[in-house]
């Protein structure tokens, strides 16, 4: 097994273990108003993609209440150290790459439109992180509460409003995205057991909507091939679950598992393909980036 494939398998095994325990690593009992993307304590930058569920999983597994992380050397550079005997957590450096396709003579290969064919791949490297709770002697600022989102509900409503996707409320028990009509259909807000449940469901369905041909053009949404019970359908649901979790974290809304019944199908696709969770988390991040970018445009126009 090559180095990259071994990392893919390590990550997949972590996610599978969590799912088998009935604890998807993207579902966390967050407090209202508290954004909890894991961040690097030294740089202040948030971790993205597959590192988000990996670090959420480690925090839950080990009881860490702080979402700040750093490397062994960063702890020393900050004037502290990692306590003896502490175990590190897995994280991944994932660098998308592209390269022109060449024929046997070294000449570029063109596609049907005459443009050079490009092969997409990624450089994947494992690195290890420690939670600040595993360290001593660090600056007090590393342990200060993370600033809360001022208005979680308004943040979620802005994502809905600027997405451009019509949201229709009906007195029913189902929530879904209707690709052919490009609409989201939800029960009325008062039918949900909490405001957080309503918004996490809304953000789940809006993540599906980003797959429309006019947006990110995801196969599961545009091809019609995703049918309940097949792998493409399960993969799209995994993308939407992660997308909802990431958006809830951004808005400071407690996350919630939308479809516990899908756990078995997620386990199946992960056991068959150790890159499936990387694709799903990458698609979820792209969906979140697209939705959040729409909320920024009106602000730029009014500035």
Give the positions of each predicted feature.
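N-terminal accessory/interface modules of nucleic-acid-binding and processing proteins
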Residues: 1-303
